[in-house]
């Protein structure tokens, strides 16, 4: 069966369903790498993407964000000039009650009898204003980090915003953006 539309799974409207020891057939995570780039260097700025509201991000979207942002930064900045980290993990198990459709579906379908559903995927639950991903760069590469965040925002189910922090953790978004030429 194909992938369902993301709007079905993006709301946090059900209780958490994460206890894998009780879930038969729960799928494994597709995303396995959470830190990319130069992990040991110190950088001037931290650019983080925050959620504007609570949401669930499917593991397919997280993997697409990881590939897109990492490839963009490698191409424009170079592997040793950034550190990229995904800060959420897909714990939430998504379920689907498969409905039989078509001719003679009533013969073999269950309908709403025992409709709990079977595990079909994983998602990360994100709270409002929580950091989703972070890129550390120096001042000359800040423009590319903001471009990477813009590309990542397009793959999220709801809107998000980014913030720029200095080494001490102070929010310098307005100061930096006013001096930058985009």
UniProtKB/Swiss-Prot annotation:
Gene3D superfamilies: Ribosomal protein L10e/L16 (3.90.1170.10). GO terms for cellular component: cytosolic large ribosomal subunit. SUPFAM superfamilies: Ribosomal protein L16p/L10e. GO terms for molecular function: structural constituent of ribosome. The keyword Signal does not apply. It holds the Pfam family Ribosomal_L16. PROSITE patterns: RIBOSOMAL_L10E. GO terms for biological process: translation. Keywords: Ribonucleoprotein, Ribosomal protein. The keyword Ribonucleoprotein applies. HAMAP family: Ribosomal_uL16_arch. Part of the 50S ribosomal subunit. Belongs to the universal ribosomal protein uL16 family. This is Large ribosomal subunit protein uL16. It comes from Thermococcus kodakarensis (strain ATCC BAA-918 / JCM 12380 / KOD1) (Pyrococcus kodakaraensis (strain KOD1)). The lineage of its organism: Archaea, Methanobacteriati, Methanobacteriota, Thermococci, Thermococcales. The gene is rpl10e.
